[in-house]
From Swiss-Prot:
Lineage, opening ranks: Bacteria, Bacillati, Cyanobacteriota, Cyanophyceae, Nostocales
Listed SUPFAM superfamilies: Nqo5-like
Assembly with partners or alone: NDH-1 can be composed of about 15 different subunits; different subcomplexes with different compositions have been identified which probably have different functions.
Superkingdom of origin: Bacteria
GO molecular function: NADH dehydrogenase (ubiquinone) activity; quinone binding
Main localization, broad class: membrane
Enzyme Commission number(s): 7.1.1.-
Signal peptide from the UniProt entry: none
Membrane association type: Peripheral membrane protein
Protein name: NAD(P)H-quinone oxidoreductase subunit J
Organism annotation: Trichormus variabilis (strain ATCC 29413 / PCC 7937)
Length: 175
């Protein structure tokens, strides 16, 4: 036992993320992105820089991802990035298990600006407005980017983890 040498511990296997089929297709066609670990259901997740979102979103639409199932925001915590998330589905006739991919765009908290995908998927309309209203993510090129849930004069972004609730809410009687 004393004669045995200590062997270096190999790097963690999870450090290398295998590329899924969509990521491979994007790479083959020259689109800059990063593969992230798949979610618990096996849905492929890719990270895209804000400047490359529109070209990649357009390419994914042309590749068959014709349905934006979900668009939302994530706050990674005070002082950390905000994330704009897009869950895309390839809908086709007689598809038992449609192909899915999730696109994440990490944005700086101080200036969270990303292009709108409204012109690619019309379902992004109210979803981008909700992400703007709750997280303050600005979707450039959106035709009607204004608050959708909170009053127009509301101050702050209620779903940010560093949001401080006002001490006083003015309630009016219904009669």
């Amino acid at each position: 036992m004393a004669d045995e040498e200590l062997k270096p511990v190999p790097a963690a296997a999870e450090a290398i993320v295998p590329s899924g089929p969509t990521s491979q297709w994007l790479t083959e066609n020259g689109f800059a992105h990063e593969s992230l670990a798949a979610d618990k259901n096996g849905v492929e997740i890719i990270k895209v820089e804000p400047d490359f979102l529109l070209p990649i979103a357009t390419a994914l639409y042309a590749y068959g991802f014709n349905y934006l199932q979900f668009q939302g925001g994530i706050d990674l915590g005070p002082g950390q990035d905000l994330v704009s998330v897009y869950h895309l589905v390839k809908v086709s006739d007689n598809a038992d298990k449609p192909e899915e991919v999730r696109v994440k765009v990490f944005l700086p908290r101080e200036n969270p600006v990303v292009p709108s995908v409204y012109w690619i998927w019309k379902t992004a309309d109210w979803q981008e407005r909700e992400s703007y209203d709750m997280f303050g993510i600005i979707y450039e090129g959106h035709p009607n980017l204004k608050r959708i849930l909170m009053p127009e004069d509301w101050v702050g972004w209620p779903l940010r983890k560093d949001y401080i609730s006002p001490d006083f809410y003015e309630l009016q009687d219904a009669y």
